[in-house]
Amino acid sequence: MINNKIILGLLALVVLSCNSINKKSNKSNYNDLHIVGAMKNVMWKGELGSSISLDSISDKQGLYGIGPESYLTGELLINNGKSYVSRVTSDSTMFVQQKFDTSAPFFVYANVNKWEEIELPQSIRTIKDVEKYVDEKTIKNKRPFAFKLIGSISKALIHIQNLPEGTKVSSPDEAHQGQTNYFLKNEDVEVIGFFSTEHKGVFTHHDSYIHLHLITKDEQKMGHLDELEINAMKLYLPKE
């Protein structure tokens, strides 16, 4: 009887030990996303003011983030710990400044320090292609997550919000007043993206799993990415 109790006790310890090992092996090397505010509240409720000051984010190592500037006066991007603000200067020019002293009505950010590099197949050309490919490649991965694309584009369309001061917003059409589009051609770029199947209307649009911001290699152009024609790019996914 005593021997049976000892054997049962040992078996319990083995099971607990195995569970502990499995928990450790399943632990991800990258942190959860941080989500502040919501796109739908900006578009439909007119919540344009600051929900987060970017300089309040303390851990800037491997930091990535995207969102609009407060009161929809520009676009924001954090790329590997560097923060950029883009603003409209004319219908064909913009001003891109590197600074953390800014804020956003909604923003998504994460720290990623290790990446898995994947050569994109030549069949992946558009934003929808990227979305589908990323979804398929990460079906067993921890979600949501940040990712990036680096390489050359044949064409791209980006926009910068430029809402007139004092404008009241209660619909997407009103929110996009002053939005200015910029066409890019044959540029080397980085695209920072965030993927989720569960945050439509929060940090992705209602018809997409991804939200993307693009910055050119020379850091002279940056904005929200609307259209894309890839020449040759590599995909970077957070390394488990």
What are these regions (language model features)?
Residues 46-103:
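N-terminal low-complexity or amphipathic/hydrophobic leaders
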Residues 122-177:
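Mid-length scaffold segments of soluble, non-membrane domains
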Residues 19-21:
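Bacterial signal peptide processing site
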Residues 208, 213-240:
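C-terminal structured interaction module
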Residues 85-145:
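Contiguous hydrophobic, core-forming segments of folded domains
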Residues 15-17:
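C-terminal motif of bacterial Sec signal peptides marking the signal peptidase cleavage site
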Residues 164-216:
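Short, hydrophobic/π-rich interface segment
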Residues 1-7:
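Bacterial N-terminal signal peptides that target proteins for export
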